From Swiss-Prot:
Pfam families: DUF484. It comes from Shigella flexneri. Disulfide bonds: none annotated. InterPro entries: DUF484, GAF-like_dom_sf. The gene is yigA. This is Uncharacterized protein YigA.
Length: 235
């Protein structure tokens, strides 16, 4: 427990510090009038013992510049990454828009994924949101919401995207004809995440992992429904 004298000394120190700071702020010419005294002030240093006030200030300035440089480098990296994502998305959108049929669009989508080094890309749609039944030939895209729900709860939870492996029974639900799937990037379609699922597959089990960026995946999941409406009527 601190003695009354110690508490009083701490209070006086705090008041003295505050008074000094207030005085220097109000009287900036102090440093001009007392230039030699300022140069003689020594500041504690963890390595060198003490350094001059000027050296201490310059070190702080260098550290500040270093932080600014690191932040600028990070911003540049993010800008370059975002530019790359933008052009990939723009190329995909133009390619899918130029499709002459739904099958052509799906093939272009699959080819785009292959060009990125993936095994492929697939779409599955919920029949209660799209007219997929006869007489259309789109029934192969249908995904039972009831069958998908356990997988959604297990892998996505409250999220819109999942990156990682799927087990055998799960693959049979979303990709019954797929072979040698090591990992997937899966996203719910539409702004309300209730129209279906888009999946990118890789043979590499470690290619897609939780924690990876999902910006491109998110943008594709928002873009596809409007393109699909050219060929499939919404319910």
């Amino acid at each position: 427990m601190k003695q009354p004298g110690e508490e009083l000394q701490e209070t006086l120190t705090e008041l003295d510090d505050r008074a000094v700071v207030d005085y220097l702020i109000k009287n900036p010419e102090f440093f001009i009038r007392n230039a030699r005294a300022v140069e003689a002030i020594r500041v504690p240093h963890p390595v060198r013992g003490t350094i001059s006030l000027v050296e201490w200030h310059m070190a702080r300035a260098r550290n500040h510049i270093h932080v600014l440089e690191e932040n600028m480098a990070l911003l540049m990296e993010q800008a370059i990454a975002n530019e790359g994502l933008f052009y990939r998305l723009l190329y995909l959108q133009r390619s899918l828009t130029a499709a002459s049929s739904l099958d052509d669009m799906l093939m272009r989508f699959h080819r785009w994924a292959r060009d990125l080094g993936l095994a492929g890309a697939s779409l599955r749609l919920f029949p209660d949101r799209w007219r997929l039944g006869a007489p259309s030939n789109h029934t192969h895209l249908a995904l039972s919401r009831q069958s998908f729900e356990p997988l959604r709860i297990q892998r996505l939870g409250q999220e819109q995207h999942y990156l990682g492996p799927l087990n055998g029974p799960e693959l049979l639900v979303v990709l019954p004809e797929a072979k040698a799937v090591g990992s997937v990037a899966m996203s719910m379609l539409g702004s309300d995440a209730d129209l279906g699922v888009v999946l990118f597959t890789s043979r590499d089990a470690s290619h897609y992992q939780q924690g990876q960026g999902t910006q491109l995946l998110h943008e594709i999941a928002l873009m596809l429904p409007e393109l699909l409406e050219r060929w499939i009527e919404r319910v």
